[in-house]
Every structure is written in structure tokens, then in C-alpha cells.
């Protein structure tokens, strides 16, 4: 399930963890609300903050090290992709039983619908969304929901950290004195603000795409994708409506055979 911790993303993950805990330490070393409550023995807020930071780090490692949905061998993946449950055979057009999947020119496996080969990971990934350099892993069928959850938790941590940094700024008679007193905290607040804006944009874009049941790859490259390029600009064969899309993404744990969904919409074989 998990890749080698000391793989190609080791430096990226190490840098993320160091930056996270250095900024947390800065917030506790300056005269912020966290520091003041800790000194007065009111530990509820500091403990909750540290626990939330820890949860964000654990989620980061989960999405970073998790198998995003690599397509492995033809035998097991073809059986999964083309297998049709007896109770649903009558609902699925006959064409789905003879789908000829495209063979990847890189890893030579047959690609299920919505999968794509990642040049960095050197694997085809089911329901490929994108390769994220932040986590040094692909975002795909198995870890996408956890990636969105991580973004949500990380955004809350960053907003809370920004508020704590603001509470720690002290007054001074001159700008020079103010910068000497608050320079380190100001630098930390600037980093947190930039990261918060970045995470907010990522979270918003992913929630929007999830609500449409489309991926970053499909949204950006639909004119190049064989099963989408013949569709109209506003047509998405996987869209079931916002609520059902969100429910399926966050709450449905069973793997989806996207060929079944695609042909139920009356699309022609590709």
C-alpha cells in the first residue's frame, strides 16, 4: 500500500515536515496567544493546535506514500475493469463486454478508462488527476479523497497559524525597532499567508472538479483524451449531478468500473 519512505520524495517530505514544525515552534516562542495560554496553564488551545498540526502531517504522509491506484498487470486489471456483475448485465449495453482498452506505450499494460501514465512515477494510474510535486506522488483513484481532506485540514491549520502570528506582533516606537522585535514572526506569517492562499486555491479547484466528477487531467486536456474529445464543451459522461458526485467521491469506497458509467450514458465504443 505504501511506497518506500526513503524514495525519491524523501527530501521534499523532510522539507515539508521541518518547515511545519519550525513555524509551529516560532509561534510558541513568540508572545502569541498560544504562548500566553501555555504560560497561564490554559493548555486546551495549545494542545488542540499541536494535535491539528500533527493530523495535517500524518495526512500529508498518507497521501504522499499511499498507492494512488497504480495499474499493475493485465490479468488482474482486465478482470477488474471488464468484469460485469450478473445483477447489472441487463443494464449495460453489449458493447461494454468487448471494450478494447488502449495499451500504454510506456509500461505496456492495458489502461482502464480514466487512467493515464505518469512519467515521474513510471506507472499508469487509475482515475489519474495529476502528479503533485508537493507530495511527490500521483493523485489518483485511491488517494484523491485523502488529498482533498489533507488540503482542508492544512488550510485550517494555516489560517489558525496566521491568526496566532497576528496575535504575537508587539508595538514599537519606530519601524526599525518593530522589525527587530517582530522580524522572525513576520517572516513566518508571510510564509503561512502564501501557503494558505495556495492551499485555498487548490482546495477550491479540486472541490469544483469533484462536484463535476471530472479530474484535473480531463479538465485541462479533454481535447486530447479519446473518450472525451468527441463530447460537447459542457458534456461530461461521468457527471451524475453535484450531490451524487460528491457522495460518490467522499463516501463510496467500492472501486468504479468507469467503462460501465460511460456506456450507460449511451456513448459509442472508443
From Swiss-Prot:
<dbReference type="GO" id="GO:0006612">
    <property type="term" value="P:protein targeting to membrane"/>
</dbReference>
<keyword id="KW-0472">Membrane</keyword>
<feature type="topological domain" description="Lumenal">
    <location>
        <begin position="30"/>
        <end position="42"/>
    </location>
</feature>
<dbReference type="GO" id="GO:0005783">
    <property type="term" value="C:endoplasmic reticulum"/>
</dbReference>
<comment type="function">
    <text>Palmitoyltransferase that catalyzes the addition of palmitate onto various protein substrates. Has a palmitoyltransferase activity toward gephyrin/GPHN, regulating its clustering at synapses and its function in gamma-aminobutyric acid receptor clustering. Acts as an inhibitor of the NLRP3 inflammasome by mediating palmitoylation of NLRP3, thereby promoting NLRP3 degradation by the chaperone-mediated autophagy (CMA) process.</text>
</comment>
<feature type="transmembrane region" description="Helical">
    <location>
        <begin position="9"/>
        <end position="29"/>
    </location>
</feature>
<dbReference type="GO" id="GO:0000139">
    <property type="term" value="C:Golgi membrane"/>
</dbReference>
<keyword id="KW-0808">Transferase</keyword>
<dbReference type="InterPro" id="IPR039859">
    <property type="entry name" value="PFA4/ZDH16/20/ERF2-like"/>
</dbReference>
<protein>
    <recommendedName>
        <fullName>Palmitoyltransferase ZDHHC12-B</fullName>
        <ecNumber>2.3.1.225</ecNumber>
    </recommendedName>
</protein>
<keyword id="KW-0564">Palmitate</keyword>
<keyword id="KW-0012">Acyltransferase</keyword>
<feature type="active site" description="S-palmitoyl cysteine intermediate">
    <location>
        <position position="132"/>
    </location>
</feature>
<keyword id="KW-0812">Transmembrane</keyword>
<dbReference type="Pfam" id="PF01529">
    <property type="entry name" value="DHHC"/>
</dbReference>
<feature type="domain" description="DHHC">
    <location>
        <begin position="102"/>
        <end position="152"/>
    </location>
</feature>
<feature type="transmembrane region" description="Helical">
    <location>
        <begin position="146"/>
        <end position="166"/>
    </location>
</feature>
<dbReference type="GO" id="GO:0005794">
    <property type="term" value="C:Golgi apparatus"/>
</dbReference>
<keyword id="KW-0256">Endoplasmic reticulum</keyword>
<feature type="topological domain" description="Lumenal">
    <location>
        <begin position="167"/>
        <end position="182"/>
    </location>
</feature>
<dbReference type="GO" id="GO:0019706">
    <property type="term" value="F:protein-cysteine S-palmitoyltransferase activity"/>
</dbReference>
<keyword id="KW-1133">Transmembrane helix</keyword>
<dbReference type="GO" id="GO:0018230">
    <property type="term" value="P:peptidyl-L-cysteine S-palmitoylation"/>
</dbReference>
<keyword id="KW-0333">Golgi apparatus</keyword>
<feature type="topological domain" description="Cytoplasmic">
    <location>
        <begin position="64"/>
        <end position="145"/>
    </location>
</feature>
<feature type="transmembrane region" description="Helical">
    <location>
        <begin position="183"/>
        <end position="203"/>
    </location>
</feature>
<feature type="topological domain" description="Cytoplasmic">
    <location>
        <begin position="1"/>
        <end position="8"/>
    </location>
</feature>
<feature type="transmembrane region" description="Helical">
    <location>
        <begin position="43"/>
        <end position="63"/>
    </location>
</feature>
<dbReference type="InterPro" id="IPR001594">
    <property type="entry name" value="Palmitoyltrfase_DHHC"/>
</dbReference>
<comment type="similarity">
    <text>Belongs to the DHHC palmitoyltransferase family.</text>
</comment>
<dbReference type="GO" id="GO:0005789">
    <property type="term" value="C:endoplasmic reticulum membrane"/>
</dbReference>
<feature type="topological domain" description="Cytoplasmic">
    <location>
        <begin position="204"/>
        <end position="270"/>
    </location>
</feature>
<dbReference type="GO" id="GO:1900226">
    <property type="term" value="P:negative regulation of NLRP3 inflammasome complex assembly"/>
</dbReference>
<keyword id="KW-0449">Lipoprotein</keyword>
Amino acid at each position: 500500500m505504501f511506497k518506500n519512505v526513503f524514495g525519491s520524495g524523501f527530501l521534499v517530505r523532510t522539507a515539508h515536515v521541518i518547515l511545519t514544525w519550525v513555524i509551529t515552534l516560532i509561534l510558541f516562542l513568540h508572545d502569541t496567544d498560544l504562548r500566553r495560554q501555555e504560560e497561564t496553564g490554559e493548555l486546551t488551545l495549545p494542545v488542540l493546535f499541536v494535535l491539528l498540526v500533527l493530523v495535517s502531517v500524518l495526512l500529508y504522509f498518507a497521501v504522499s506514500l499511499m498507492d494512488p491506484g497504480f495499474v499493475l498487470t493485465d490479468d488482474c486489471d482486465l478482470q477488474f475493469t471488464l468484469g460485469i456483475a450478473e445483477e447489472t448485465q441487463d443494464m449495460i449495453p453489449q458493447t461494454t463486454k468487448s471494450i478494447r482498452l488502449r495499451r500504454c506505450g510506456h509500461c505496456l499494460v492495458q489502461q482502464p478508462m480514466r487512467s493515464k501514465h505518469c512519467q515521474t512515477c513510471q506507472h499508469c494510474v487509475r482515475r489519474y488527476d495529476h502528479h503533485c510535486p508537493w507530495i511527490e506522488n500521483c493523485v489518483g483513484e485511491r488517494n484523491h479523497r485523502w488529498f482533498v481532506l489533507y488540503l482542508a485540514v492544512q488550510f485550517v491549520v494555516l489560517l489558525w497559524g496566521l491568526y496566532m502570528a497576528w496575535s504575537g506582533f508587539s508595538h514599537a516606537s519606530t519601524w526599525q525597532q518593530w522589525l527587530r522585535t517582530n522580524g522572525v514572526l513576520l517572516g513566518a506569517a508571510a510564509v503561512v499567508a502564501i501557503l494558505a492562499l495556495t492551499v485555498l486555491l487548490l482546495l477550491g479547484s479540486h472541490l469544483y472538479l469533484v462536484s463535476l466528477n471530472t479530474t484535473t487531467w480531463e479538465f485541462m486536456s479533454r481535447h486530447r483524451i479519446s473518450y472525451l474529445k468527441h463530447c460537447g464543451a459542457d458534456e461530461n459522461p461521468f457527471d451524475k449531478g453535484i450531490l451524487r458526485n460528491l457522495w460518490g467521491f467522499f463516501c463510496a469506497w467500492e472501486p468504479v468500473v468507469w467503462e460501465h458509467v460511460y456506456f450507460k450514458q449511451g456513448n459509442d465504443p472508443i
